[in-house]
Amino acid sequence: MTQHLERPELLSIAATKALDKLQQAHPELLAQWPTERQNELETVIGLSDFIASSLVCDGQLLLWLSEHLDDKEHAEQYRQQLETKLATTADDVGLMRQLRAFRRQEMVWIAWRDFTNKSTLEQSLAHLSQLAEALIMEAYQWLYNQCCKEWGTPTNSAGEAQPMLVLGMGKLGGGELNFSSDIDLIFTYPENGDTVGGRRSMANAQFFTRLGQRLIKALDQPTYDGFCYRVDMRLRPFGDSGPLVMSYAALEDYYQEQGRDWERYAMIKARVMGRESFTQYQELRQMLRPFVFRRYIDFSAIQALRRMKSMISSEVRRRGLSNNIKLGAGGIREVEFIAQSFQLIRGGREPSLRGRGLLETLAAMKQLALLPEKQIEHLEQGYCFLRKLENLLQAIDDKQTQTLPDKPLDQIRLAFAMGYADWQSLFEAIELHMSAVHLVFDDIIGTDEDDAGCSVSEQYNEMWTMAKDEDVLLNIMAELEAPDSANQVSTILGMKAELSKRTLGPRGREVLTRLMPEVLSRIVPRPDASAVLARVTKLIVRVATRTTYLELLGEHPAALGQLIRLCAASPMVAEQLTQYPILLDELLDPQHLYNPTPLDQYGDELREYLARIPEEDMEQQMEAIRQYKQAQLLRIAAADIAGALPLMAVSDHLTYLAEAIITAVVNQAWLQMAEKYGEPTHLVDRNGKGFGVIGYGKVGGWELGYGSDLDVVFLHDCPADIYTNGKKEIDGRQFYLRLAQRIVHLFSTRTSSGVLYEIDVRLRPSGASGLLVSTVESFDEYQQKEAWTWEHQALVRARMIYGDVPLFDAFSDVRKRILTQPRDTQSLQVDVVSMRHKMRVHLGSKKNGMFGLKQDKGGITDIEFLAQYLVLQHSHTEPYLTRWSDNVRIFDTMAECEVLSLSQASALKQAYCVMRDDIHRLNLLGLPVYVDESQFVTERETVQQIWQEYLVPSSDE
């Protein structure tokens, strides 16, 4: 089409500038360019900065292109050409150079043919996929041979050589790779065994792990020549925390026992790269098929599909993706989702639905009459249009983007390349296709919401319409017999005044006009209307300029109901929703909202949540972890408010959530450090990082509250003479210091989703003046020779919350030895009582007639000090007392060991739990932790009696 359009002025200017640069760089080569293709050259370099810069960098490409642009069978020779080029390559550096040069050459060829309409969409997608497969497989083959020379050939028990199979996932697996794309891979090998023929034998798992690491580096690492592909390995079993390579047997066990819906979804497109080279390919295929395609019509997938639909909508709102042709409403993702949903549901019974290609699947759906032909036509046409647009958009500058451009030059480039006279015409065509796709998407997947909303009384419509007239509002309130009408009217008038200061478009005003009468009808009659209305309207004002959130509440009555319920129950939750309105998405599914993640699944769920974000995009990774935390806090609080979780379970959930986040942050910080410096060499033959995080206080005692800080200490076990193995080599201990600094930074950086946790590291050896991270040996020495009694008290509530087995064992040994050492009773009593007195002076209640639940006599802190004192006093003879770090189980253990009587232990536990429960309730209500002094009298007296019995009182007690 572009050949029939006159080149726009803006494009001509860009073409002239690009041609001038090319003329300056390669005048002699440019002179050899065929004159009949001069106009084509100018057009293409005006359309694509990638092509223009590639030709400037490598003038020989001009000669090569003039000979090969019309070679239709070109892609079939990729592997043969690469094999020839690599035959004389001597080392990994040469390999990387050859791969990058070949990729650039072929990507220019593909982009050129795309911009000049010489290739169909199907041809272009196939060429891109074949090129990636060729680069992967020839790099693999070269590296496999090199690794066999270095370490021997991996074999099974029968002595047969074992290959590593590379599974291409996503669009690569489907043969539909886009122009600038990550490649999602999974590595596997048929059987365990050992290498033979090397200097020393090595387990197959170790051989293939090293091979996989070198393959990723060959493709992914940026060099002077660029890179080939961003390699994403997070779709493998267990994600980042799993082994890089797994045997068939381990792979099968994982998918049978732990495979999840999204992994079935991902595995639909899985394809073995270069499968014709491997006799073991069919075995792998047969093994995976039952996991992906169930033998029966799998309607159980429908609920999972609805959840995925909700995730798509959330993604659009979260990242402002309305102009994203992949993730926006009606985008490429929705077409893929429709096709793959039919594959998941019916693929077990219908072999024709097991194809990897999307257009192939749509054709099968048409043949099986699973959708009306008209709907399938809309999907096919929309998909082809958007995929072509996506490729051209990315080929402008070889950038991975699906967001429509803002720059006029890029807009006119796209319009011209797509065959449209101007940007507006193209944009209207985009909207037409995406609207058609979205209609099909909504029709097929459906929604759990009841579309029929109840009619809102005219009084509430009038209340909102007349919300500038106080007298009218008061009259309506009187007619409705609304409680506390004056305060409610004041809130409504204040909301209107705030909204008048904001720029609301016609759409936003229309949505508010529909939404607010419904909001008022639900809140105004409530006994607690004043407080609830103030909280809900504050949130609505906050999101007023973000129409998608208003629509979410307006179109989902159940979500609005959940919002009101939660805001009524807890000012803390209301404030959280107001600060982070992205959490409104969580209200769409009450079953999900009121059922927190199982304790043992926080880590897996967070890994899955982060898998959608490129590892190198640290800003988005940080944001995603915070969003995940906020969503989980909301779910825990919702279950708490609903009475579905007792206090201990709430703390368990908050603690396990914190541990999962700590693991994710450590992994993120480690990736950043390792990329820059490599890893300390003492880890070469060891799993783990040689790094530990010790949790103290509430996190150490499984007693976190909603707003708790994390008290932590960092440890490592790096020997003194160790260095890292990266290009920028540093001392191993310096590496761990920088790692700890990075972790603290990742936790404390404030993003749009807030701070992750407040981190307190003052409990480390020597406090604020000490090193941020210590070796286990120096930690041990400090605890033995320099630590104060209060630091040993703190150690009672300490446990390792992140770390590998050697460090865990080492820390546990240090903790037990310190806690069980013999102590002089009188000195210990003096130290503990003195410290408690200092705390009470500084932190105790100054309010007459009030009891401070935490710091006043007989309160929580007295109970904690009793537990710590008794552990330190009696662990020398009863080492079992050191087993637990939480107060409840410490008291249980004391009763078992007869350190306390059963009645004393029960009384302390009961007092501790009821006071914690009240602190927790006050936190949810956003209130200080003080109660009338007439409360908890019995509990306080009991605590003080036990204190008097076991601790010698100081003169001020």
From Swiss-Prot:
Keywords of this entry: ATP-binding, Magnesium, Multifunctional enzyme, Nucleotide-binding, Nucleotidyltransferase, Transferase
Q: Which reaction does it catalyse?
A: [glutamine synthetase]-O(4)-(5'-adenylyl)-L-tyrosine + phosphate = [glutamine synthetase]-L-tyrosine + ADP; [glutamine synthetase]-L-tyrosine + ATP = [glutamine synthetase]-O(4)-(5'-adenylyl)-L-tyrosine + diphosphate
Q: Name one GO cellular component term.
A: cytosol
Alphabetical list of SUPFAM superfamilies matching this protein: Nucleotidyltransferase, Nucleotidyltransferase substrate binding subunit/domain
* Gene Ontology annotations of biological process type: regulation of glutamine family amino acid metabolic process
The Swiss-Prot or TrEMBL record lists the needed cofactor(s) as: Mg(2+)
From the UniProt record, which GO molecular function terms apply?
A: [glutamate-ammonia-ligase] adenylyltransferase activity; [glutamine synthetase]-adenylyl-L-tyrosine phosphorylase activity; ATP binding; magnesium ion binding
Query: If you read the UniProt record, what top EC class would you report for this enzyme, in one word?
Result: transferase
The entry's family comment says: Belongs to the GlnE family.
Q: Which PANTHER family match?
A: BIFUNCTIONAL GLUTAMINE SYNTHETASE ADENYLYLTRANSFERASE_ADENYLYL-REMOVING ENZYME (PTHR30621:SF0), GLUTAMINE SYNTHETASE ADENYLYLTRANSFERASE (PTHR30621)
- UniProt-listed HAMAP family: GlnE
Q: What task does this protein carry out?
A: Involved in the regulation of glutamine synthetase GlnA, a key enzyme in the process to assimilate ammonia. When cellular nitrogen levels are high, the C-terminal adenylyl transferase (AT) inactivates GlnA by covalent transfer of an adenylyl group from ATP to specific tyrosine residue of GlnA, thus reducing its activity. Conversely, when nitrogen levels are low, the N-terminal adenylyl removase (AR) activates GlnA by removing the adenylyl group by phosphorolysis, increasing its activity.
Q: What is this protein called?
A: Bifunctional glutamine synthetase adenylyltransferase/adenylyl-removing enzyme
Q: Which organism is it from?
A: Photobacterium profundum (strain SS9)
